[in-house]
């Protein structure tokens, strides 16, 4: 029998599979943005996670987040870049206009993997938060288009 946890954000609680690494925003988005039935491509996930990793490093350097939080985020990103947890990026490839749903799916997965790195359980956002820490200094209006630009660079004749 599938077990669930109750994850909550500013919009309220959402029933999430207990072993899931995504959170409440993603739980809602899976239902709201079921356009194609296909999640985002793994190369987009990789590109996006690289941006999140870089932001965590920059936020540690400026002391916007503490080293413990930042290091956990970096380690979580490294695990995802190594191919782990990619199955947790479930938001449909066609989602909200500026990629907000994909951005939040990414923030929640990175946060929950980082929480496990810290020895915590998924959803214990009082220790590390998807918006306050993983998304710090970022906007999906910037990160989403940059990730697509990043995807084109390795195969571009201009590089």
Provide a role label for each language-model segment.
Residues 1-93, 105-109:
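Generic N-terminal targeting/processing segments that precede catalytic cores or assembly contacts
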Residues 38-54, 118-135:
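Short, conserved aromatic-histidine micro-motifs
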Residues 93, 117-119, 141-143:
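Cytosolic, long alpha-helical scaffolding segments
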Residues 103-115, 119:
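A generic, well-ordered mixed alpha/beta core segment in the N-terminal half of proteins
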Residues 130-140, 145-146:
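Mobile "lid/hinge" segments at catalytic clefts and subdomain interfaces of large enzymes
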Residues 149-155:
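Conserved small/polar residues in nucleotide/adenosyl-binding loops
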Residues 157-159:
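Acidic, Ala/Val/Gly-enriched low-complexity intrinsically disordered segments
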């Amino acid at each position: 029998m599938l077990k669930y946890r109750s994850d909550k954000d500013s919009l309220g609680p959402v029933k999430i599979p207990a072993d899931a690494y995504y959170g409440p925003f993603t739980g809602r988005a899976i239902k709201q943005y079921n356009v194609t039935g296909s999640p985002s491509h793994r190369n987009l996930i990789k590109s996006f996670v690289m941006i999140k990793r870089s932001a965590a490093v920059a936020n540690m350097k400026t002391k916007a987040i503490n080293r413990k939080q930042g290091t956990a985020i970096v380690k979580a990103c490294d695990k995802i870049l190594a191919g782990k947890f990619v199955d947790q990026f479930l938001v449909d490839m066609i989602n909200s206009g500026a990629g907000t749903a994909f951005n939040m799916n990414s923030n929640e997965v990175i946060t929950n993997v980082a929480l496990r790195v810290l020895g915590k359980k998924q959803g214990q956002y009082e220790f590390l938060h998807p918006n306050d820490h993983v998304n710090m200094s970022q906007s999906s209006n910037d990160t989403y288009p940059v990730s697509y630009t990043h995807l084109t660079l390795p195969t571009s004749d201009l590089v």
